[in-house]
From Swiss-Prot:
Signal peptide: none annotated. This is 4-diphosphocytidyl-2-C-methyl-D-erythritol kinase. The active site is at 9, 140. It catalyses: 4-CDP-2-C-methyl-D-erythritol + ATP = 4-CDP-2-C-methyl-D-erythritol 2-phosphate + ADP + H(+). Pathway: Isoprenoid biosynthesis; isopentenyl diphosphate biosynthesis via DXP pathway; isopentenyl diphosphate from 1-deoxy-D-xylulose 5-phosphate: step 3/6. The gene is ispE. One of its GO terms (molecular function) is ATP binding. InterPro entries: GHMP_kinase_C_dom, GHMP_kinase_C_sf, GHMP_kinase_N_dom, IspE, Ribosomal_Su5_D2-typ_SF, Ribsml_uS5_D2-typ_fold_subgr. It is an enzyme of class 2 (transferase). It comes from Salmonella schwarzengrund (strain CVM19633).
Length: 282
């Protein structure tokens, strides 16, 4: 049995710069990983079978991103003659990241499967090939596959590696799940934030264009941010529902965590520019 990190991410800023004819929104965002997340347990099989041993309530196994990623890699490696005969896997997951939280849990799970099985099966696909496969599963998957903090443009698929400060974060989940379309379909969502260079953006105060909509539509998000903002700079990650506050030290973050209201599920984690998944491969 092998064990693989599937880390969370934060969007340190997120700006919506437009909307394409196909409905997708163009954006500029800054991804950084956390040293906190799910763990995937993978046992290679030799009969060509893919088994997910920890199904998710309400999601058919074949629709789960974990299984879809495994089958996608199997198909791509097979078609290019790089899949050893009988390659398969038993996969289970220790879930710590909430669904609909804006921490990238599902995308991270898919990326971990692609990277781990490529290694375990010895398929030999490059990171570029894995990232291209990952993009077909979701716009956030490639950053997890590549494993380095990044400035993202387009619909999130154009990535430039960056090294923002590795701060400590108090991340809080207010107890609601926010489907991404709820935010992106809101008519009041800002959709024309001017595009700026990464150098300019890194010098500006960070914010998230989705935050005003999440706070308006979900009072729990508004309450969580109102509480966090009493202690430190705080904002929404992704389209929510998680919010985070940034601190220079772990002790400062933990002092605030001790004061968290009972209705708020929160944890402290360090921002890291190299994914814990990729540290495993070094």
């Amino acid at each position: 049995m092998t064990h693989w990190p599937s880390p969370a991410k934060l969007n340190l800023f997120l700006y919506i710069t437009g909307q394409r004819a196909d409905g997708y929104h163009t954006l500029q965002t800054l991804f950084q990983f956390l040293d906190y997340g799910d763990t995937l347990h993978i046992e290679p099989r030799h009969d060509g079978e893919i088994h997910l041993l920890t199904p998710v309530t309400g999601v058919e196994n074949e629709d789960n991103l974990i299984v879809r990623a495994a089958r996608l890699l199997m198909k791509a490696a097979s078609e290019s003659g790089r899949l050893p005969v009988g390659s398969g896997a038993d996969i289970s997951i220790e879930k710590r990241l909430p669904m609909g939280g804006g921490l990238g849990g599902g995308s991270s799970n898919a990326a971990t499967v692609l990277v781990a099985l490529n290694h375990l099966w010895q398929c030999g696909l490059s990171i570029d090939e894995l990232a291209t496969l990952g993009l077909t599963l979701g716009a956030d998957v490639p950053v997890f596959v590549r494993g380095h903090a990044a400035f993202a443009e387009g619909v999130g698929e154009i990535l430039t590696p960056v090294n923002p400060p590795e701060k400590w974060y108090l991340v809080a989940h207010p107890g609601v799940s926010i489907p991404t379309p709820v935010i992106f379909k809101d008519p009041q969502l800002p959709r024309n934030t001017p595009k700026r260079s990464i150098d300019t953006l890194l010098k500006c105060e960070f914010s998230n264009d989705c935050e005003v909509i999440a706070r308006k539509r979900f009072r729990e998000v508004d309450a969580a941010l109102s509480w966090l903002l009493e202690y430190a700079p705080s904002r929404l990650t992704g389209t929510g529902a998680c919010v985070f506050a940034e601190f220079d030290t772990e002790s400062c973050a933990r002092q605030v965590l001790e004061q968290a209201p009972e209705w708020l599920n929160a944890f402290v984690a360090k921002g890291v520019n190299l994914s814990p998944l990729h540290r495993e491969l070094l």
